[in-house]
UniProtKB/Swiss-Prot annotation:
This is Zinc transporter ZupT. It catalyses: Zn(2+)(in) = Zn(2+)(out). The gene is zupT. GO terms for cellular component: plasma membrane. Belongs to the ZIP transporter (TC 2.A.5) family. ZupT subfamily.
Amino acid sequence: MLHIPPENVWIALAVTLAAGLATAIGSLLVLFSRRPNPRLLAFGLAFAGGAMVYVSLSEILNKSIASFALAYGERTGFTYGTLAFLLGVIVIVLIDHFIPNPHDSLDKQDPAFRENSREYLKRVALLTSIAITAHNFPEGLATFFATLESPSVGMPLAFAIAIHNIPEGIAIAVPVYFATQNKFYAFSASLLSGLAEPVGAALGYWLLSGSLSHATFGWVFGLIAGVMVFLALDELLPAAKRYAKGHETVYGLVAGMGTLAISLVLFKW
């Protein structure tokens, strides 16, 4: 079993908490501005998607393979790392199948934005909150374990997830605010959803802390990489394209990848 210094656990948990709290920023943008800028949302979503794809394929998947290689040898390690990645994709596909896409309610043309449909708004608010909270659990695990094993990987990943959490905060706050006309309720709903990330991280560590090994990290990192890549390709990039008026999606995608590439190089130094 690997020994993890207690201070590393607290650092990883703090980073995960900071990423989760970004949902509250999204709610504040709704409550204290006229309307979210759709082109900025498009760029931000694509930026987060590019960052998550890059760090998942260039760092997290490689760490899965390296961890398995330390446990079982190079050839077996590569095989297990690939299987863990594919298993992560399958897991998030199943979650996505049963829980609706949390970005659907951001559309200003959706009936949820009509002030005379309070009951519909309440239903949208509830479903959106549940959806985003469920998606935040694996994101919390990803941030926590990536930071726990390597802050140089965890910090950029947390940054990407934080950016992606801002529009999720908007997705929660908008229907809650229109349904209740209460800013506190809208802010609280977004905040509580974001707190699912550190809660998921704490639960994951509690379950796995007694059996942390190279093989355990291999499975965790492989699953994380699969989950993050699927979320980026299935949710973030399509949502970005939905709000884009021009080339914001491509610019955001390239900027996200470039920013993560540079930050990872800087962390190496």
